[in-house]
Every structure is written in C-alpha cells, then in structure tokens.
Regions:
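Catalytic pocket-lining loop regions of alpha/beta-barrel enzymes
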Residues: 121-201, 210-212
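Electropositive phosphate-/nucleotide-binding environments in soluble metabolic enzymes
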Residues: 82, 86, 144, 171, ...
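Mid-to-C-terminal alpha-helical segments outside catalytic/metal-binding sites
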Residues: 228-288
C-alpha cells in the first residue's frame, strides 16, 4: 500500500528516517514550515530555511525514492515576534509560486493572541490570492478554543473550508470540525497528541471521509513511521483495506491536489539516486 505522509518536518530528521519511510511504503511527504525550537532573529533566517525546504530537502528525499513537497508560512509561534512577522509575510508571495509548494502552512494558533489572529487571517488571504489550500495548526494548549477561533476567522474572511486542513485534532475537537467541510488531520505521537488505538477508535466512530493521519515528526520525541504503524493496527482491528487506503493515500493526495501542483504521475515515477544538488550529494564523497 502506498502512503502519502501529509505532515513531517524532515528538515530536522536524519537519512535513516528516509530509508525506513521508503521501506514502509511512504512515497510522498509534505513538509510544513514550522518553528525550529528557538526563536529566529531575522527575516534572513527564514529565507535560508525556505530555500532549504524547497531545494536541498526536496533533493535529499528524492535520493531515497520519496517525493518531497511543502507548505510555507509564518508559523503561529513566531507570528508574535515583531522582529520577523511582517517581514516574513512580505517575503511569502514569491515563495508561494515555487515548484513543490502545495499550500500555505502551518498557520493558526499557539497562544491564541491578537497577533496570531491577525496573521492567520492575513495568510488565509495569501492562500486565496495564490489559489492554494491552507494547513492549520491547532494549539497544544486550550485546543478547543483554538479550533473555535480558527473556524470563526475562516468564516470572517470567507475562506472556503474545503480548502483547509485543520491538524492535530483530538477526540474533543472532532465534533467541532466534522461538519465544517474542512479536512481533519491527526498527529500520531509517542506520548502526546494522539496514539494509534485512539486513532482507530476515532475512525470507527466518525468514519474516514476527509480524515488524514500524520506523524508530525520533528526535532522532538516523534516517530516518522507512525502512519505505517497505525495502518498495522487498523488491519488488526479489521478495518477494510479500501478504508485504510483512503485515510493514508486518497484523502491527503486529494486535498493537496487542490493546489493544482501535485502530479500523481510524478508520485509513480522512480527517482534516480545518482543526482547532484548544486554540486553536492548525500554520499559525502565518492563511492567506496
């Protein structure tokens, strides 16, 4: 079964992860822009970060047979930082036209501040202007209120819900999002957010329409193989193969195809591992 990983921060992962992901059936990965663990102090650091995601990281993934895509944004946490917020917002339009950029994200809330509301609305407008879908981060604290405010702002700016993926959902937020028209994302984590047994129960209770799962693997304690591990449990619990495939392939691919930039033929085309990126390779020298 082919898997499309719709949320993994591969910039912070190692080559072993790519190898194991490919062996587990992951053929495409979507990397949202996010916070790096400490504050960035200038807009220039975002330039380098965006360039790395659309350039080197895309190349690095392909050397392991995985197609790499991304969404770009000013992330919710750094929306509160006046050293960078307006500058990054001004920077984004030229990056949102780049190859492999399938949406605007992660946007949304961290502490649910007025600044975060302002930049969420502004970036939904950017997504509209560039005809791209939006990937929305829901806060780790006060998640229900964050989801409620997200949906309210979407309504205020009249952004179409079918072009929004609201991520990091839990049992508490599903009832809020299920009838909104948004795609619902669930991040399967080792100790927080969502685990495999709870995820399977959510799917059994609410169905698989507009549902996607991801690992949200990053620099913290996380596991880029959480999707295939969840697939294994789905099978053990008797879920039909076509329903499993819907969650891990058809739903995420259909959502990001709304960008008009996701070519399914590309996902089926093998990648040559003998390429160079600006004169560099993943081998760190000639073959032995």
């Amino acid at each position: 079964m082919r898997i499309f990983e719709p949320h993994a921060h591969m910039f912070s992962r190692v080559t072993d992860d790519y190898e194991q992901m490919a062996l587990a059936g992951i053929v495409g990965v979507l990397e949202p822009a996010f916070w790096l663990g400490q504050p960035r102090t200038s807009v220039g650091s975002f330039v380098d970060y965006f360039d790395a995601i659309i350039g080197w990281e895309r190349f690095r993934a392909e050397q392991f047979g995985i197609r790499h895509y991304c969404t770009l944004s000013l992330n919710p946490k750094e929306a509160n930082d006046d050293r960078v917020n307006d500058g990054v917002l001004a920077l984004l339009p030229r990056y949102l036209e780049k190859d492999g950029v399938l949406g605007v994200g992660e946007i949304g809330f961290d502490d649910i501040t007025p600044r975060e509301e302002r930049y969420l609305a502004a970036q939904l407008e950017l997504a509209r202007a560039h005809d791209l879908p939006a990937l929305v981060h829901t806060p780790h604290r006060d998640k229900v209120r964050g989801v409620e405010r997200t949906l309210a702002i979407m309504r205020e700016v009249k952004f179409p819900p079918e072009r929004v993926l609201i991520d990091h959902n839990t049992e508490q937020t599903v009832p809020l999002v299920i009838d909104s028209g948004c795609t619902m994302g669930f991040s399967i984590y080792p100790d927080t957010k969502m685990d495999e047994p709870r995820m399977v129960e959510i799917l059994r209770q609410w169905g698989t329409d507009r549902m996607v799962i991801n690992s949200a693997a990053d620099w913290g304690k996380s596991d880029p193989l959480k999707i295939p591990k969840t697939v294994n449990l789905m099978r053990q619990k008797g879920m039909a193969e076509h329903e499993i495939e819907k969650v891990v392939w058809h739903n995420p691919v259909s959502f990001f195809a709304k960008s008009g930039r996701l070519d399914l033929r590309e996902l089926d085309t093998p990648v040559s591992p003998n390429q160079l990126f600006e004169g560099n390779s993943i081998l760190r020298g000639p073959r032995a």
